[in-house]
Amino acid sequence: MNRMFRVLGFWTGIFAVMFYLGDMKDASLLFFGQTILFVFLSYLNLTERMYIYIFGAYLTIFFAGFTYYSIFIMVPGGGGH
């Protein structure tokens, strides 16, 4: 299970670099933070159950934050195209 957290760290790192190259600095910093978190957690050698609990908590926080952002902060049609 710790290898899967390294895989998550790898992919969030890839997304962070792509966001940075696309001049999306806030998203880039968010994904760099997630990369550091996932790689750090992968080297703790926890039990598989603990990794599942941590991932479940991560998903819960992400879904709540994304829902809050999309309802209260995001401006519909604000892309400027």
UniProtKB/Swiss-Prot annotation:
Keywords assigned: Cell membrane, Membrane, Transmembrane, Transmembrane helix
Disulphide linkage map: none
Membrane topology: Multi-pass membrane protein
Cellular localisation: Cell membrane
Cellular component GO terms held in the UniProt record: plasma membrane
InterPro entries listed in its UniProt record: DUF2626
Transmembrane domains' residue ranges: 27-47, 54-74
Predominant place of localization: membrane
Domain of life: Bacteria
Pfam family, one: DUF2626
Protein name: Uncharacterized protein YqgY
The species this protein was found in: Bacillus subtilis (strain 168)
